[in-house]
């Protein structure tokens, strides 16, 4: 991507008033620049949930990991982020007023593919909702109950149960039963809670 296109894209991101679309555009721009160097990025955590739920949950920043095995050398990372006039360090950056965290390799346990969606400057990858759901439920109950994580998990489940996002529930069960999580009962409980609120059947509830 040449300097003129980058400048135009940054102006577009700066002018965007919708925070979710702003994150989407920034993720698209950053992904395009890293892809030119052979590294595929994926939006993770609350940032992925914000985009998947179309803003029902607002994360307030943008978190990305690399989906390819290798990341870029320090000098090359600085060079790319310099093209965006980013301020900060190797992981934590500020670009046109947005906080962008470029983390390490993505950690995924689900056997489903990353979600790929169209975006203004090229497609972006989003973390698998099966992973996101189990992870957020873990955060809800880890070291006491986190209301923020709980609200986030419920909004994700509501979008899924509303039919706007397909999820492999067998994978949710399998991931939740892994030693890294072991929180299937908590997942079943939270999904049923949202299902009851929506007056639909919980796909995790045993018949």
Question: What residue spans do the PLM features occupy?
Answer:
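Compositionally biased terminal segments of proteins
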Residues: 1-207
